[in-house]
């Protein structure tokens, strides 16, 4: 199953973003995790 890349729409309850990305609960797309 493919992970979701940057700016891909996602659901915070079911975060399928790629490693080092996190689903933004505000914008509802995958954002790069800097920390």
Curated annotation (Swiss-Prot):
SUPFAM superfamilies: omega toxin-like (SSF57059). The keyword Kinase does not apply. The keyword Transport does not apply. GO terms for cellular component: extracellular region. It is found in: Secreted. Pfam families: Toxin_12. InterPro entries: Huwentoxin-1 (IPR011696). Transmembrane segments: none annotated. Belongs to the neurotoxin 10 (Hwtx-1) family. Gating-modifier toxin that both inhibits the peak current of human Nav1.1/SCN1A, rat Nav1.2/SCN2A, human Nav1.6/SCN8A, and human Nav1.7/SCN9A and concurrently inhibits fast inactivation of human Nav1.1 and rat Nav1.3/SCN3A. The relative rank order potency for Nav modulation is Nav1.3 (inactivation EC(50)=45 nM) > Nav1.7 > Nav1.2 > Nav1.1 (inactivation) > Nav1.1 > Nav1.6 > Nav1.3 (IC(50)=8 uM). The DII and DIV S3-S4 loops of Nav channel voltage sensors are important for the interaction of this toxin with Nav channels but cannot account for its unique subtype selectivity. This is Beta/delta-theraphotoxin-Pre1a. It comes from Psalmopoeus reduncus. The lineage of its organism: Eukaryota, Metazoa, Ecdysozoa, Arthropoda, Chelicerata.
